[in-house]
Amino acid sequence: MKLLIGASSSKIFHMQEFAGKLEEKGIETKLVLDSDFADGFPSRKLKNWFSSNEKFKKLIKDFKPDVIFVDRVRHFALETSKTNIPLVIHLRGDHWAEITMARETLYKSMPKKFAINKWDEIGENCFKDSRLILPICNHLTKITKERYLQKPVETMYQAINPENWFHEKGIELNHPCVGILQSATIWDKAKEMLILPEVLEKMPHVHFYWAGDGVYREKILPLLEKYENFHWLGALEYPGKVREFLSEIDVYALISGIDMSPLTLQEAQLMEKPVIATNVGGVPELMNDGETGFLVAKDNPKELFEKLSILLNNIENAKKMGEKGREFIKNNFNLDKICNDFLNHLKKYNIGDI
């Protein structure tokens, strides 16, 4: 079978490893950056608004794929939907909720309303014409099935290579410390960090480091930088600096208002760090509450403080949780397992020659 993978720039690192493992299993793959072969309106690059699909057509003609796999519903997926080649979508987030949030926040002006409506239209066309949708967690699978009652939908988690996550010296932090590694690009996710002031006040001896950036940074930073024990590091180079950061922290905290399958939660556990995460979306599927760390209720600084105190005051128990976390991620989300899941889903629905 010949599989063409169109990946977004933010996920191409992971898709390279995914494609490599599929090659080991006898699947001929070709991985491309999706926007290099298909773009148009809306696009951040004005010159691409009137792009033709000739590069995409040539790619299809030269490679002759049996199946096309994408990790987002953009122009590459849309062009695929116009062919007779089966389109398989790895759905990484709640597309419909994100469209709604965008309309309510960043896309209120008339030009941006037009753009978000076009993204919505493209997405619906891609979903409608796809052969298989693979949401990234069971929580998202349930949401997707409610929208597409007749469409094949199966969960496919994010694969991760444990060999990439090893302790590496570099970044030096003050201790004890809590590491937060998340972006501020979606307000409903980012605004959960506004519960931190109450925790920072109660834990003046604990240093909190936020590695991340995004359009909502300035809505968050002014409230947190008032505290001497809060430090903002900005966005970190991936994966090297992220690995150094996770090597150095004592506890990892995911403080998010909505999330499906945060990769950083997998990475922190592979780095043998005890984790604390907001109990939202698909987050509970990526950890064992009470075993590899703790889930905390949304908008509950009191519980966050209590769970952080448990981990920081019992170093030996926290260490054991971190060790269990690495084993949990290795066993459940390794490349070999997720690639087998992917191929089994294709076989189940007679997609490609498996």
Role assignments for model-derived ranges:
Residues 289-290, 294-301, 310-316:
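Conserved acidic donor-binding segment of nucleotide-sugar-dependent glycosyltransferases
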Residues 257:
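Aromatic "clamp/platform" in nucleotide-sugar-dependent glycosyltransferases that forms part
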Residues 274-277:
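Short hydrophobic beta-strand element within catalytic cores of glycosyltransferases
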Residues 218-236:
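Nucleotide-activated donor-binding/catalytic signature segment of Leloir-type glycosyltransferases, i.e.
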Residues 110-133:
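Membrane-proximal helix-turn-helix segments that form the acceptor-binding/catalytic region
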Residues 83-105, 112:
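Active-site proximal beta-strand in glycosyltransferases
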Residues 303, 310, 317-332, 338-344:
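A short, well-ordered alpha-helix in the C-terminal region of glycosyltransferases
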Residues 4, 134, 170-191, 197-201, ...:
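Conserved donor-binding/catalytic core segment of Leloir-type glycosyltransferases
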